[in-house]
């Protein structure tokens, strides 16, 4: 599961939950491309605090989106906390996507600082 929220003129907060099977990854790509279609550039905070693992088949789907969006990306923060397998998956994704504009962070405050949105308040749902 995922949710995409606009948190600035060209910035988005993406919340992921559980696993990310290929059908969900493909729907996410469609939704994200539709939302960012008219934007020359954008930034994202991807909140993976409640994610478990990225499905193996979804890895390439997400990687393709990341590579295609490299030019338009301002900055992107991937929030991962205390999940070594997920951390490793995203390290591999970031290496393969080859962009210094992406970073793994440990909490939402670090993410906001990295993308330059310190004034935004993001409340976690429990």
PLM region descriptions:
Residues 1-126:
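Amphipathic, Lys/Arg-enriched alpha-helical "gate/interface" segment within cytosolic domains
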């Amino acid at each position: 599961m995922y949710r995409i929220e606009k948190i600035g003129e060209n910035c988005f907060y993406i919340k992921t939950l559980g696993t990310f099977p290929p059908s969900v990854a493909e729907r996410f790509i469609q939704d994200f491309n539709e939302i960012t279609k008219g934007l020359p550039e954008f930034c994202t905070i991807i909140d993976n605090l409640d994610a478990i693992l990225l499905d193996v088949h979804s890895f390439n789907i997400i990687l393709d989106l990341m590579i295609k969006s490299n030019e338009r990306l301002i900055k992107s923060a991937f929030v991962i906390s205390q999940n070594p397998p997920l951390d490793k998956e995203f390290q591999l994704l970031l290496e393969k996507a080859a962009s210094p504009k992406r970073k793994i962070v440990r909490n939402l405050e670090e993410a906001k600082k990295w993308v330059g949105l310190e004034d935004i308040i993001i409340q976690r749902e429990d």
